[in-house]
From Swiss-Prot:
InterPro entries to which the protein is assigned, alphabetical: Aminotransferase_I/II_large, Ethylene_sulfur-biosynth, PyrdxlP-dep_Trfase, PyrdxlP-dep_Trfase_major, PyrdxlP-dep_Trfase_small
Coiled-coil stretches noted in the UniProt entry, renumbered to this chain: none
Region (Disordered) location: 1-21
Protein name from the UniProt record: Probable inactive 1-aminocyclopropane-1-carboxylate synthase-like protein 2
Organism: Homo sapiens
Annotated signal sequence range: none
Native organism taxonomy: Eukaryota, Metazoa, Chordata, Craniata, Vertebrata
Length: 568
């Protein structure tokens, strides 16, 4: 479409070739409105043409969602321009939507047309991003996506519980952090071998990671993953966190719009990481909680389910480039057996899929009768060139603030491409030195840290599960990871994702942060993830708040049932 502003008459007093700002804005607004009209027409054609296709209901729903997303972006641009016009003196304002703690949308008073526009109302961060004329459409998408993903976490960061300074602050049982061995880690990181500052540590590093750290990571993984042969440091790339590694892999293995299969429920941070830069879709392979003839245990992953998900994706025209596995699984805590892993790898090879395996919880197995089997322990892989392993220290060592993640891949091209992201996501030289010293002290890890960490995880898990049993709350009982997957369906009436969200908001209102199943792409509403790897006094207070919320919810359900009965 040509820009009408090119043909507008030039008012006297203005230089030829320049268009008044208000005319330019209205021209852009006209173009967007026409585009919006066209998109709405296509949207309703989709609705009409697919009404009778019951077998294509899912594709129908997804088509609607795509059109609604387009409409949302166009409306966003319109509001952007309208707000820009108001700020520059145009006689135009728009009532801005806001959302309360329950998620209900509120609108301001009707805009008034006047020569002196009313002051722009104070906006939340999310609203400000929505109307910020300085952001591109992509920038608005990123900002809104970030706010919607981390709004509650940011609230927690601003109002953290402290036993002396802030007893009414948020307690976070929603972010997977291990806070049980801070005393051990603080002591270890203050020892003399940690405090080294050399010239090379203050200079730009090898973007793949300092050679001394990559060598130590290769040795560490060879030892703890029980690799049959020594792992090659040249196959190691280190970045500032496992999500950075995953994001880099998504970028180099997929083009925008392509996809990975991921068994769901799965760690929600991967969805954020894959979308932020790479625009890669994660297609959930839904797992059911019910035991059936084909589902011999809850949330069982089978090759049949992978086959079905891949077929559905291809029928919808999606290009699937890989399979993502988390082992031990987050948030379920399941550990895949070597036989199961081999079946998943053979499935991937059959369809030329990459396999990304996140083993970030490999040392957080606290039941001595259970053995974790790393993919790196296998003598041969069906397709070693398409198998990529991620590990980091955030969970097993409880130092998420160090921001360290490592990739191990036999594929030299993948390693080289991921290394490019070290330019943006590298780790400071001093941190790399400390990490190297930490990982190479195998005696301290084996004799001091791991036994203590496993004992404390086991005791914290024992306390939490006893509390859940006393409350008669079902949960997925596993002995790895930092979390328990709990079933709160009985507190939802009806059992929907909207009711799940409202219960989540009730927890927030009582300064308790949990993670709800929807953020893990869980198929069934009512599941929550509860982190137990915290000090006992704080854990006990958190559980008191947890019980208070459930009592409030129970009373609210009784009132609702009575009101429904009276209406009948």
């Amino acid at each position: 479409m040509s820009h009408r502003s090119d043909t507008l008459p030039v008012p006297s007093g203005q230089r030829r070739g320049r268009v008044p700002r208000d005319h330019s804005i209205y021209t852009q607004l006209l173009e967007i409105t026409l585009h919006l009209q066209q998109a709405m027409t296509e949207h309703f054609v989709q609705l009409t043409s697919r009404q009778g296709l019951s077998l294509e209901e899912r594709r129908h729903t997804e088509a609607i969602c795509e059109h609604e997303a387009l409409l949302s972006r166009l409306i966003c641009r319109m509001i952007n321009l309208l707000q820009s016009g108001a700020a520059s003196g145009l006689e135009l304002q728009v009532p801005l939507p806001s959302e309360d703690s329950r998620g209900d949308v509120r609108y301001g008073q009707r805009a008034q047309l006047s020569g002196q526009p009313d002051p722009v109302p104070q906006l939340s961060d999310c609203e400000a991003a929505f109307v910020n004329r300085d952001l591109s459409i992509r920038g608005i998408d990123i900002s809104v996506f970030y706010q919607s993903s981390f709004q509650d976490y940011n609230a927690y960061q601003k109002d953290k519980y402290h036993k002396d300074k802030n007893t009414l602050g948020f307690i976070n049982l929603g972010t997977s952090e291990n806070k049980l061995c801070m005393d051990l880690m603080t002591e270890r990181l203050q020892e003399s071998d940690m405090n080294c500052i050399e010239d090379t540590l203050l200079q730009y590093p090898d973007w793949r990671g300092q050679p001394f750290l990559r060598e130590e990571v290769a040795r560490f993984l060879t030892y703890y993953c029980r690799a049959p042969t020594r792992l090659d440091p040249e196959n190691v790339v280190v970045l500032n966190g496992c999500c950075s590694v995953f994001c880099a892999l998504a970028m180099v293995l997929c083009d925008p719009g392509e996809a990975f299969l991921v068994p769901a429920p799965f760690y929600g941070g991967f969805a954020f990481s894959s979308r932020l830069y790479a625009k890669v879709e994660l297609i959930p392979v839904h797992l059911e909680s019910e035991v059936t003839v084909t589902n011999t245990h809850p949330f069982q992953l089978t090759v049949d389910k992978l086959e079905e998900a891949l077929l559905e994706a291809r029928l919808e025209g999606k290009k699937v480039r890989g399979l993502v596995l988390i082992n031990p699984q987050n948030p379920l805590g399941d550990i895949y057996s070597p036989d199961s892993l081999m079946k998943y790898l053979e499935f991937a090879k059959r369809y030329n899929l990459h396999v990304i395996i996140d083993e970030i919880y490999m040392l957080s197995v606290f039941d001595e009768s259970i053995t974790f089997h790393s993919i790196l322990s296998m003598k041969s892989l069906p397709d070693s060139n398409r198998t990529h392993v991620i590990w980091g220290t955030s969970k097993d060592f409880g130092i998420s603030g160090f921001r360290f993640g490592a990739l191990y891949t036999h594929n030299k091209e993948v390693a080289s491409a991921v290394s490019a992201f070290g330019y943006l996501h590298s780790i400071s030289g001093i941190t790399q030195h400390k990490l190297c010293q930490l990982l190479q002290n195998t005696e301290w890890i084996d004799k001091v840290y791991l036994p203590t960490n496993c004992y404390r995880l086991r005791e914290a898990h024992k306390y939490i599960t006893a509390e859940l049993k006393a409350l008669e709350i079902p949960f997925h009982n596993r002995s790895s990871g930092l979390y328990v997957w709990i079933n709160l369906k009985k507190y939802l009436d009806p059992c929907t994702f909207e009711e799940e969200r409202l219960l989540y908001c009730r927890f927030l209102d009582n300064k308790l942060l949990l993670s709800r199943g929807k953020t893990y792409m869980c198929k069934e509403p009512g599941w929550f993830c509860l982190i137990f790897a915290d000090e006992l006094p704080r854990l006990k207070l958190a559980m008191r708040r947890f019980c208070d919320v459930l009592q409030e919810q129970k009373e609210a359900l009784i009132v609702k049932q009575l009101e429904d009965a009276m209406r009948e």
